[in-house]
């Protein structure tokens, strides 16, 4: 396969309810990405768009076609990907495969969502459809409840007192808020930098033991990336960032992973694929934008990705090993918790952040020193879809 590089990235700020439509939001991100690479819409050979809830948010189906027309890519092949929170990661991964195959040399990928505009009630109800409609959804399953159960299971499996685990989870939240507060693209930019553990633990209970500050927000936003073959990339940028490995796995309902929980076996398999293709190990990763939809999810993900021993991730956060300057910098963007979670755009937003980190373009206080290898991690549903990507500096 051919080498594939990220040559341009663009992103809106992730926010609460927006007045712009999803087509308009994506156009903003796509225009920025193309401008970075000094490309015009007619240079784009195909579009790959993540969008999970647009049918319910705006009553708009087939959004990929309207996005293509709106950004000046009329008649260009356009595809939409739906994998819950992993939608944009699926889109970027598929775009990578098309360029790696040699079929296209320049493509645009990304995602868009207006989940905040839906409001918490409608967003929660429609989002729950990403659980199994045969068994989980009829039982009233919501994702805060799923991760609350995983929190109890984690505490029991690794013999950690629940209050101690909650304090470790609070440190995850505090770190995410710290980074997000200085990220101009983040939903909580300028907010919560000095939040205390007491405030995190004392916020109202969403699903015991998870409190408000354990949970990420619904967000509106879009992100886009331009991918190009190595030959083309060298003509477009002096700082190509190569996607050197990808992985994806699915498992259906969470019960299929019962022999592994609270580990997410699909994530282990997906990340192992990515590591193998890239020819690296977890020890080589300088930073990772991982799927912290809930604070417990950060602990579970960082262990499944191989960064920390099972049951020990909370201790790693306590020691600063998951922060900038530690063993591996986790979510220097602020992650889903602080940067925000526009469902169908989140994965592309992770690629945006890792790319800028590797290029050394991030604001002081968030920049990972001399970062050479970064990773993305997105989870769709309650573990039903996992996508991982490895990005490396190409100069």
Regions found by a protein language model. Name each.
Residues 1-86, 94, 154-168, 172, ...:
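Conserved active-site "lid/cap" helical segment
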Residues 20-27, 57-61, 89, 141-148, ...:
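Electropositive phosphate-/nucleotide-binding environments in soluble metabolic enzymes
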Residues 41-51, 77-83, 107-112, 166-174, ...:
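Beta-strand segments within the central parallel beta-sheet cores of soluble alpha/beta enzyme folds
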Residues 54-62, 255-259, 292-315, 326, ...:
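Short glycine/threonine-rich loop-to-helix capping motif typified by GTGT followed
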Residues 249, 274-281, 291, 301-308:
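Short hydrophobic alpha-helical module
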């Amino acid at each position: 396969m051919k080498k594939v590089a990220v040559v341009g990235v663009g992103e809106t700020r992730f926010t609460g309810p927006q007045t712009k439509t999803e087509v308009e939001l994506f156009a903003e991100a796509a225009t920025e990405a193309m401008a970075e690479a000094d490309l015009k819409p007619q240079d784009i050979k195909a579009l790959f768009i993540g969008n999970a809830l647009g049918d319910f948010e705006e009553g708009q189906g087939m959004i990929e076609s309207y996005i293509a027309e709106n950004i000046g890519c009329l008649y260009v092949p356009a595809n939409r990907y739906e994998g819950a929170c992993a939608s944009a990661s699926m889109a970027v991964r598929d775009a990578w495969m098309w360029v790696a195959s040699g079929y296209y040399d320049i493509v645009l990928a990304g995602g868009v969502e207006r989940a905040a505009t839906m409001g918490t009630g409608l967003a929660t109800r429609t989002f729950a459809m990403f659980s199994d409609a045969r068994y989980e959804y009829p039982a009233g399953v919501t994702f805060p409840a799923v991760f609350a159960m995983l929190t109890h299971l984690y505490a029991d499996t690794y013999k950690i007192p629940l209050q101690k685990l909650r304090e470790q989870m609070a440190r995850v939240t505090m770190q995410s808020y710290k980074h997000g507060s200085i990220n101009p693209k983040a939903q909580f930019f300028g907010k919560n930098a000095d939040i205390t553990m007491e405030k995190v633990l004392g916020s109202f209970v969403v699903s015991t033991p998870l409190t408000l500050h354990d949970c990420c927000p619904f967000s509106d936003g879009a992100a886009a990336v331009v991918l190009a073959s190595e030959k083309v990339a060298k003509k477009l940028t002096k700082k190509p960032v190569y996607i050197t490995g990808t992985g994806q796995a699915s498992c259906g309902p969470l019960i299929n992973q019962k022999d592994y929980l609270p580990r997410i076996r699909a994530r282990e398999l997906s990340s192992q694929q990515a590591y193998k293709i890239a020819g690296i190990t977890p020890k080589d990763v300088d930073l990772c934008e991982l799927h912290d939809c809930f604070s417990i999810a950060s602990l579970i993900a960082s262990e499944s990705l191989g960064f920390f021993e099972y049951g020990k991730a909370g201790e790693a956060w306590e020691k600063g090993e998951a922060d900038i300057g530690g063993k591996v910098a986790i979510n220097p963007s602020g992650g889903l918790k602080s940067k925000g979670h526009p469902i169908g755009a989140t994965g592309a937003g992770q690629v945006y952040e890792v790319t800028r980190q590797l290029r050394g373009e991030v604001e002081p206080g968030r920049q990972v020193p001399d970062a050479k290898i970064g990773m993305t991690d997105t989870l769709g549903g309650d573990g039903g879809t996992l996508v991982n990507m490895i990005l490396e500096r190409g100069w």
